[in-house]
Amino acid sequence: MNAEMREGSSALPQLQAHSPVADNIDLMDIDEPASNGSFEESPATPFDDDAFVNAGDTDQEDDDPDTKKWIVNDSRKPRKISEKKRADHAAFDVWIEENQQDLSKGLDKFIVDDDGKTFQSLIRDFENKRIITSPRDYQLELFERAKTQNTIAVLDTGSGKTLIAALLLRWTIQNELEDRSKRLPKRIAFFLVDKVALVFQQHAVLACNLDYPLEKFCGDMVEDVTQDFWHKTFDENMAIVCTAEILYQCLTHSYIRMDQVNLLVFDEAHHTKKNHPYARIIKDFYAEVKDLNKRLRISRAMTASPVDAQIDPKIARSPELEGLLHSQIATVADPTALHNSSTKLKREVTVEYGKCLPEFETGLNRALKDLVGEHRLFQKPFAFTATAASELGPWCADRYWQLFFRGEEVVKLEAKTEREILRKSAYSQEIAAQVNKVREAHRLVGQHEFASPSSDLLSSKVVILLRILRGEFRGVDHKRRCIVFVRQRNVASLLTDLLQQPEMRIPGLEPGILVGGGRPEASYDNAKVTYRDQVLTIIKFKKGELNCIFATSVAEEGLDIPDCNVIIRYDLNNTLIQYIQSRGRARQEGSIYIHMVESENEEHVKKVCQNQESEDALRKFCEALPADRKLTGNNFDMEYFLRKEKDQRQYTVPETGARLNYKQSLICLAAFVASLPHPPEVNLTAGYLVLSVPGGYQCEVTLPESSPIRSATGKVYASKAVAKCSAAYEMCLMLIKGKYLDQHLRPTFTKQLPAMRNARLAVSSKKKEQYKMRIKPELWSVLGEPTELFAMALTLADPTALARHSSPLLLLTRQPIPQIASFPLYFGKNRSSAVHCVPVPGRVELDDNQIQGLVAVTLAIFKDIFSKEYEATAAQLPYFLAPTLMQHGSDFTSVTDLSRIVDWGAVTFVRDNERVAYALDDEADEFFKNKYVADPYDGSRKFFLRGRRHDMKPTDMVPEGIVTPGHRAWRVSCKTHDILNYSLSAWSKSRAFLTPREDQPVVEAEVLPIRRNLLDDHIGDDDLEPKPCFIVLEPLRISPLPVDLVAMAYNFPAIMHRIDSNLVALEACKMLNLNVRPDLALEAFTKDSDNSGEHDAEQISFQSGMGNNYERLEFLGDCFLKMATTISIFTLIPDKAEFEYHVERMLLICNRNLFNNALEVKLEEHIRSMAFDRRSWYPEGLTLKKGKRKDLTRQHVLADKTIADVCEALIGAAYLTAQEQTPPNFDLAIRAVTVMVKDKNHTMTSYSDYYAAYSPPAWQTAPCNSTQLDMAARFEARMGYAFTHPRLLRSAFQHPTYPSVYEKLPSYQRLEFLGDALLDMASVEFLFHRFPGADPQWLTEHKMAMVSNQFLGCLAVYLGFHRAISYCASAIQKEITEYVTEIEDALQSARDDASKTPCNRHATTPSPGDLPAESFARDFWVRCSRPPKCLPDVVEAYVGAVFVDSRYDFARVRAFFADHVRPFFEDMRLYDAFANKHPVTFLAGIMQGRMRCAEWRLLVKDLPPVVGAGAGTELETPQVVCAVRVHGLTLAHAVAASGRYGKIAAAKKAIQVLEGMDAEAFRKAYGCACVLGEEEQQAAQTIATELEVFPAFSASGLEVAHHGSAV
């Protein structure tokens, strides 16, 4: 099967297969561990369809009558390894043994913790601990509450307030669309913010999450606009993000009325007080609407605290806030329930620093003040530097002026000075003097000698800060993230600059700055900071390019900062809100929050103490709120409601009597979720959504993605708690039915998981077995007296390539030969010609004389040309050869009488003459031309006569330069090397009876080459060129065969070998009822090396001359097999989840299934694994009278994987054949899939069968609401496809976290499963036809680029798909927003670069999306971060939805690919380096290219059982350890469930370790003393240069393709 992406203009792709890296690295140790217990093949990714693991559960398999009974070949004995390798493996074993305990840590995360507990003990555990409730429960409960009443949400920073706002906006807009469909007046929603910077941020977030027209306004953007402008804005948009003042002015001028607003969202609502615009909007306009029916239904506010400024929480103004906003506060009853999504603070500490010195001025500051101190522009800078010297230190104060008077800023200062003076007076003589003072100040700073930074020149506060940072960034920790909060922008800038000085740099710390969008005059940096700049800084912070940010209050609220583990309050907070919000940034596990307090400063101490007191008071205040203000979740007073509810169901397991009731179902489900595979740092939980429905409450439970069943819905009950239990109960029943809970209600999924995710159903390319091999086709077994014959003409397309006149050869057979594909023959000196095998119409009935003549010609060819004298009758010959009267260029297809084209004269002459009679004295000179002569004593010597030489006699010495004869007499017994002895090759005993005449004529001739394999183009010219010589004819035999017939018959062995191979392949196709094109049939069955199919390895035992092997067809067939089975499973099994779809598909397309089905029909016998053999092409069953005999090999050794690969190649051949039909179709390929998989889940024989078997589900055909119709209309305008069923489109964008009960639609997962395979096929089609000469490895790697998550995520943003996704997870909202910002920045940079380069060679087709159509480099996405998985998922789901909606029209998929994907890949050279971005490949380049090390290995071995773990668990959940070993030391290691991903993980870790390490440090650390040879050094230098192509390439950026063919 196709290899996963192994990670050219760039030579990076050559590292794997062609570069010196591949020659010097022990590839066996990388790809195939040689020690016992190590994996023989790298298993595949989870859900990698070809790498499915057999469950090994014999009971389960026996229960299913359709279960495959796999045949598994025993592994062959391991090949021998060198002593060096053996020592390395032994050392690796010792290392594993010594570190087994450490390696085993964390493995219990993948095993059910409670596996050994009884069910009763689980019950007792549950009684003593509450089930953790997902934060999403509270978010959705708050969302539901906000839909019915005005609400003030009081939630911690990072707990998802913005998500709730987005959900509410979407819900409001969807209701607005329904109202508009009813002809109700238009209304619009407003999202109001307090700060200008937040306008851009919140608009960017909402625009990423709402696929509706949104607009943003603030400040200068709406000055001097008219009423028409606002009317147009309100008509064209569904929502507006703006500062509150903007809306207030619009209401004041009556550009809009309050009854035209359907939603108000107040961001950070605690600002609603006094004359704040929030308060004025409510008091002046909202409250004035007396008719409650005309008021907007919801006025909602978001805040982290109802407390503002320094107000005592005990007298908090929540009643005032509630009354002013006409809303009710809503907060969580148990704040700790949000901790797993919010703050995870470990400790909060106070650090003291020495008292600051009194304010003073440095000498530079005083000198500058004397020059420009009176100028207004310098008043704020001087005010800052007056305090900077004492608070930061004199070095920072002087450094401020050095930065202030940078060269590019001086001109701006002069211009500002002029404007300032002119503003006071139209003309002033002081202008020149003041400008000169500015210039003088610049010269003064330029001439000042600045000292290097040192602790003596820094304040004690800065010194302590540096000490803290050094302690926090000690060692290598790539996950360390720190924010230092300061009060002033200049302080942030100067501290960042200080840490960038060489003397002050802290290893591992990369400083950055995050400040607001204002432009204070005191700042030395006058550049305006945009929201985009802020987001790009945050992205760098997230990626680790920056890990310590100096930030002002802008980082406290609003901006979505990545989770941190160090927060430092350099300047203490002024308000409780600042404290709560800045502390909320410390969300990583084990975070620390540091207050920097001045020694002996009671005010500082009081502030810190007051923080805790105020927070405690606030918490008590929230707890004291009335019950209707609290979000209780779904567990509130569960015991009471369960006792009260009588209508509870119960299930008893018949076999064991175990009972499942409502309360216990929560425990069972929690245990099951905990048993699912997950990273050690992640805690999986089930999500519960309880909605109010007629009659009470109904709950939907959603399980994590790794679960085989994703969701279930319970019954309606009067309480939330019982409704929740009902949903859990329904889910448990489904798990029991699916056998994911055992007879004791314990999870079995962990034990079954390897059966569905690892590589036990894959077969190995290393496991081989002997199989019978068909040498000859069945056609030749039809013997007997011929009554009628059919003919095939063997002609040359370019007969001049032979360099001798020739005529076609007729092959006469008892049955017609199928069409044989043309193929080339190679004649040396760059001469070649295609051979056409042309079936001649009709048949011929011959008399006995004619038959005997054909027998004579056939046997004469065998005897005279090939030195094989057979005794055979016409009944014994499988075919006959005959000369023809027609030429190579003749049209044999128009022959009407077959017997007329046979050269019967030549046939009769051959039949009547065994040899041409030769009279020594009576022959004319013409006799000695154009005859074919054979040596009866030496079968290797054949001659063409050129003519008589009257100037030579037999006793003349053989001239120099004539090729010497090979016979023994010439070398041993001949005393004279004359022409006579040259011509007589008989042995000594025979020579005694021969006395050739010495007066006979001498003839000039050509010695013909004996080479038969004309199929091989890798030959020397000398092997095929005739050599001149001089002979006498008396000891030789002149053949009766015509020379033009002989010239063509010399090619017959190669032709016959290819015909035999083609016929055997076609017989296999006929056996399977597949009418495949002949050349494709042969290609599909051709295996030309021992490791065909291993595209990334050097070929072993390559056999030339076999033509194209199966690899390209296998690449194509693999993808079609995936698509066909995917469509079939999607069609036939509509009620299963995506996970089960993957399982079912794995069972169909896994190599083990193909391998076993192939063996059942003996397909392996037809595989062509042997190149041309000069003794195997002769007919079988004939009696050989004279000539060498060789027993034919009738067996060949094939790897299990080879047989499976041939199955896929045959599917590929069927696909190409079907595409050539009129019209092009898939029918033949679909029949091939059905034959190969042989499964009830794929029984289709034509493409139309797929849709004929599809029954549209009820949700697809249900009536659409206005929201769904609006979405379909917008997508039609954007994408060009009009959906017949808009609900399909809606489903394609519904994330699994979005409750299905909202719109009664399933999530996109089933459609994504379908679209993934469809998009794969479209990509493979494009590459296969666009690059007909590309090898399968290249095709696989570049296909991975096209279908990678990284590209599809970019495409989702490019097409605007991200705005249409419906989800209920704040983490997804955050990820999408960050990724969209990054990808749009990369796109803009690409456009900017294109505008600077008019003749951009990467210009491609304009985008049809909503972005401007222009030319730019389409690889801008390569260097971006990984996208959130939902983005590539919705692209695939959209493709799947279009496919289903169009009644399975694949042309729609091709159109999507051509319009939206192909423009990015017109120049595939852009992605050569990306295609090779595989961790192991890249590590190989680093080790040899940069480190110059040759002694390293990547070793994989089974991890021994963990002490204390049950043996059964170990057997069912195998773990392997992979280590990068360098000179006997472990550089990096990883533990994984499969060898393949262990190697990837270990390589990533090794790359991380080597990042920033130079060759000298590496050699010292690992004792490397490798000395490379001259060629190796040159190759290493080349590799090192190539690695610079991706200078930022690091382990964090490595991506392995998620899709594609299984390995």
Swiss-Prot record:
<dbReference type="GO" id="GO:0005634">
    <property type="term" value="C:nucleus"/>
</dbReference>
<dbReference type="Pfam" id="PF04851">
    <property type="entry name" value="ResIII"/>
</dbReference>
<feature type="domain" description="DRBM">
    <location>
        <begin position="1478"/>
        <end position="1556"/>
    </location>
</feature>
<feature type="binding site">
    <location>
        <position position="1527"/>
    </location>
    <ligand>
        <name>Zn(2+)</name>
    </ligand>
</feature>
<protein>
    <recommendedName>
        <fullName>Dicer-like protein 1</fullName>
        <ecNumber>3.1.26.-</ecNumber>
        <ecNumber>3.6.4.-</ecNumber>
    </recommendedName>
</protein>
<keyword id="KW-0051">Antiviral defense</keyword>
<dbReference type="GO" id="GO:0050688">
    <property type="term" value="P:regulation of defense response to virus"/>
</dbReference>
<keyword id="KW-0479">Metal-binding</keyword>
<keyword id="KW-0930">Antiviral protein</keyword>
<keyword id="KW-0694">RNA-binding</keyword>
<keyword id="KW-0347">Helicase</keyword>
<dbReference type="InterPro" id="IPR014001">
    <property type="entry name" value="Helicase_ATP-bd"/>
</dbReference>
<keyword id="KW-0547">Nucleotide-binding</keyword>
<dbReference type="Pfam" id="PF03368">
    <property type="entry name" value="Dicer_dimer"/>
</dbReference>
<feature type="domain" description="RNase III 1">
    <location>
        <begin position="1063"/>
        <end position="1219"/>
    </location>
</feature>
<dbReference type="GO" id="GO:0003723">
    <property type="term" value="F:RNA binding"/>
</dbReference>
<feature type="binding site">
    <location>
        <position position="1493"/>
    </location>
    <ligand>
        <name>Zn(2+)</name>
    </ligand>
</feature>
<dbReference type="InterPro" id="IPR003100">
    <property type="entry name" value="PAZ_dom"/>
</dbReference>
<comment type="similarity">
    <text>Belongs to the helicase family. Dicer subfamily.</text>
</comment>
<dbReference type="InterPro" id="IPR056755">
    <property type="entry name" value="DSRM_2"/>
</dbReference>
<feature type="domain" description="RNase III 2">
    <location>
        <begin position="1272"/>
        <end position="1447"/>
    </location>
</feature>
<feature type="site" description="Important for activity">
    <location>
        <position position="1429"/>
    </location>
</feature>
<dbReference type="InterPro" id="IPR005034">
    <property type="entry name" value="Dicer_dimerisation_dom"/>
</dbReference>
<feature type="binding site">
    <location>
        <position position="1436"/>
    </location>
    <ligand>
        <name>Mg(2+)</name>
    </ligand>
</feature>
<dbReference type="InterPro" id="IPR036389">
    <property type="entry name" value="RNase_III_sf"/>
</dbReference>
<dbReference type="InterPro" id="IPR000999">
    <property type="entry name" value="RNase_III_dom"/>
</dbReference>
<dbReference type="GO" id="GO:0051607">
    <property type="term" value="P:defense response to virus"/>
</dbReference>
<keyword id="KW-0464">Manganese</keyword>
<feature type="short sequence motif" description="DEAH box">
    <location>
        <begin position="267"/>
        <end position="270"/>
    </location>
</feature>
<keyword id="KW-0862">Zinc</keyword>
<feature type="domain" description="PAZ">
    <location>
        <begin position="905"/>
        <end position="1040"/>
    </location>
</feature>
<dbReference type="GO" id="GO:0046872">
    <property type="term" value="F:metal ion binding"/>
</dbReference>
<dbReference type="Pfam" id="PF00636">
    <property type="entry name" value="Ribonuclease_3"/>
</dbReference>
<keyword id="KW-0677">Repeat</keyword>
<comment type="function">
    <text>Dicer-like endonuclease involved in cleaving double-stranded RNA in the RNA interference (RNAi) pathway. Produces 21 to 25 bp dsRNAs (siRNAs) which target the selective destruction of homologous RNAs leading to sequence-specific suppression of gene expression, called post-transcriptional gene silencing (PTGS). Part of a broad host defense response against viral infection and transposons.</text>
</comment>
<feature type="region of interest" description="Disordered">
    <location>
        <begin position="1"/>
        <end position="74"/>
    </location>
</feature>
<dbReference type="InterPro" id="IPR038248">
    <property type="entry name" value="Dicer_dimer_sf"/>
</dbReference>
<dbReference type="Pfam" id="PF24995">
    <property type="entry name" value="DSRM_2"/>
</dbReference>
<dbReference type="GO" id="GO:0005524">
    <property type="term" value="F:ATP binding"/>
</dbReference>
<feature type="domain" description="Helicase C-terminal">
    <location>
        <begin position="461"/>
        <end position="632"/>
    </location>
</feature>
<feature type="binding site">
    <location>
        <position position="1312"/>
    </location>
    <ligand>
        <name>Mg(2+)</name>
    </ligand>
</feature>
<dbReference type="Pfam" id="PF00271">
    <property type="entry name" value="Helicase_C"/>
</dbReference>
